[in-house]
């Protein structure tokens, strides 16, 4: 417990046939940008299994497209670790860093930008290549929401006001789990775009919210021991215990039930996609893109997350404590002068 907690995920597990190559080469990109500099940091990074995660999120991708997915996963977790210590308890410092990173969405960064920002700039440049302006605007909007969520979490820690209810927590955690940018990249990796007029439809929006919720619930179970070791109070298990007075086991069982119910709803929504195509009068190519979005983006981010969480070395207490009080081995967020 907790990585061995079982969830019934009624979706097939998949993995890119190019995983072994991508796994062997995964350190090249973060090292080239100064995001990993020491052997200790490299060893810690490899324990996370981020190439494995990307190969499950993007099983249709190979070569440079899969490499982009691996690099995004590497970046996500290097970025997230920067907020595990004092910075993540200081809203002003958090906003300073998230603003420095988000600036890459608007244009070239100054040389003084921190390494983690230059890493994101490279990811964004490669992600937006070949995608329509409408898609880039949608993805940028998702990224800004992701960054804003970190400031909200820092406010909670700064004022020592852990979330009192599951609903309050979900409203913020849905942003910082990073699922929407992850799903967006599936389109780029597969060289397709879901029809833009369908993206905000009720059915697709509900499917995506379930994907987000399942991911964050799986993550909170897997990361429970790590977060307990670090003194984190904002985890769904802890919140349910505070809100309802439940035991840890009952809180975990409730989350298992929530995931099961959400995935039952998800399958019903999936069955409505042909009718969505009819309502929006999609042509054959657009229907194919919608089916690919279901198969290669939403399904894979749900099932891939589960398979990876059960094996990743990221979520044990030793991984958390090895980095010390600041939560990371190398400072990647400092602005140079």
Curated annotation (Swiss-Prot):
Mg(2+) 1 binds at residues 80, 84. It comes from the Bacteria. Pathway: Sesquiterpene biosynthesis; pentalenene biosynthesis; pentalenene from farnesyl diphosphate: step 1/1; Antibiotic biosynthesis; pentalenolactone biosynthesis. One of its GO terms (molecular function) is metal ion binding. It catalyses: (2E,6E)-farnesyl diphosphate = pentalenene + diphosphate. Binds 3 Mg(2+) ions per subunit. A motif (DDXXD motif) lies at residues 80-84. Its EC number is 4.2.3.7. GO terms for biological process: antibiotic biosynthetic process. The keyword Metal-binding applies. Keywords: Antibiotic biosynthesis, Lyase, Magnesium, Metal-binding. Catalyzes the cyclization of farnesyl diphosphate (FPP) to the tricyclic sesquiterpene pentalenene, which is the hydrocarbon precursor of the pentalenolactone family of antibiotics produced by a variety of Streptomyces species. Belongs to the terpene synthase family. Monomer. This is Pentalenene synthase. It comes from Streptomyces arenae. The lineage of its organism: Bacteria, Bacillati, Actinomycetota, Actinomycetes, Kitasatosporales.
